[in-house]
Design a protein with these regions (language model features):
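Terminal targeting signals and extreme-terminal segments of soluble enzymes
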Residues: 1-131
Length: 131
């Protein structure tokens, strides 16, 4: 996707996710949520932050897989540490692979706001399989 040879997935456009960088075992996404992502109490819905983390963690794992292998999330645990609002500015999500086996992988991620404050962290388990 960074080289422009693959299009971003449709969900990235819907949720305004941008792939910033990807290296083997690590990926960085950004997102600037707007009021369309607000929940009833005037903060960005936690589901957007969870989806951002799930996406960056999957991409981090994908960067390590050979052609013909895929993955799907089995479990994700998110810790919400600070409310996200328009004033939070650009969100940056970083995902890293902790361990990847032939069938299961473990990842960790963090989301920071424009002031570099951590707004959420996550750990995830992913199933790895042949396509």
């Amino acid at each position: 996707m960074i080289a422009g040879t693959l299009p971003p997935p449709p969900v990235a456009g819907l949720m305004q996710f941008d792939l910033v960088s990807a290296d083997p075992g690590r990926a960085v996404f950004s997102c600037r949520p707007d009021e369309s992502a607000y929940n009833p109490i005037g903060a960005v819905h936690g589901g957007l932050v969870c989806a951002l983390l799930d996406s960056v963690l999957g991409c981090a794992l994908h960067s390590t897989l050979p052609q013909g292998r895929g993955y799907t999330s089995v479990e994700i645990k998110v810790n919400y540490l600070k409310a996200v609002r328009l004033s939070s500015g650009l969100l940056t999500a970083t995902g890293t692979v902790v361990k990847s086996g032939t069938r299961v992988a473990f990842t960790e991620g963090v989301v920071t706001d424009a002031s570099n404050a951590t707004v959420a962290t996550a750990s995830s388990t992913l199933l790895v399989f042949d396509l």
